[in-house]
């Protein structure tokens, strides 16, 4: 489940740290979160799609590592990102 160009640009504009930012950790986590949510809805209807499930687990692991990095650098940025994306209950 890939993201369209317009959707990517919208995510970049929403989560960028400075005006020319396109690849900060916040932007990467936002893109991964969107892809994860799309893929999880796909898997609810396609239970036996094991290759997509494996890709989903890889994306979740990547997002977890990126969030750990953000948390180690700044607890404030981490909590703001978590609240903005609503990924922790």
UniProtKB/Swiss-Prot annotation:
MF terms in GO: rRNA binding; structural constituent of ribosome
Listed InterPro entries: Ribosomal_uS15 (IPR000589), Ribosomal_uS15_bac-type (IPR005290), uS15_NS1_RNA-bd_sf (IPR009068)
Coiled-coil ranges from the UniProt annotation: none
GO biological process terms, semicolon-separated: translation
Gene3D superfamilies linked: 6.10.250.3130, S15/NS1, RNA-binding
Regions crossing the membrane: none
A GO cellular component annotation in the UniProt record: cytosolic small ribosomal subunit
UniProt entry tagged with the keyword Signal: no
Top-level taxon of origin: Bacteria
Assembly information from the UniProt record: Part of the 30S ribosomal subunit. Forms a bridge to the 50S subunit in the 70S ribosome, contacting the 23S rRNA.
PANTHER family (alphabetical): RIBOSOMAL PROTEIN S15, BACTERIAL AND ORGANELLAR (PTHR23321), SMALL RIBOSOMAL SUBUNIT PROTEIN US15M (PTHR23321:SF26)
Function: One of the primary rRNA binding proteins, it binds directly to 16S rRNA where it helps nucleate assembly of the platform of the 30S subunit by binding and bridging several RNA helices of the 16S rRNA.
Family: Belongs to the universal ribosomal protein uS15 family.
Protein name in the entry: Small ribosomal subunit protein uS15
Species name: Prochlorococcus marinus (strain NATL1A)
């Amino acid at each position: 489940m890939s993201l369209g160009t317009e959707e990517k640009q919208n995510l970049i504009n929403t989560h960028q740290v400075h005006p020319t930012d396109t690849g900060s950790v916040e932007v990467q986590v936002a893109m991964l979160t969107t892809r994860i949510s799309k893929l999880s809805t796909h898997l609810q209807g396609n239970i036996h799609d094991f290759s997509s499930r494996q890709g989903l687990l890889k994306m979740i692991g990547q997002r977890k590592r990126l969030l750990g990095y953000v948390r180690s650098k700044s607890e404030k940025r981490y909590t703001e990102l978590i609240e903005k994306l609503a990924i922790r209950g």
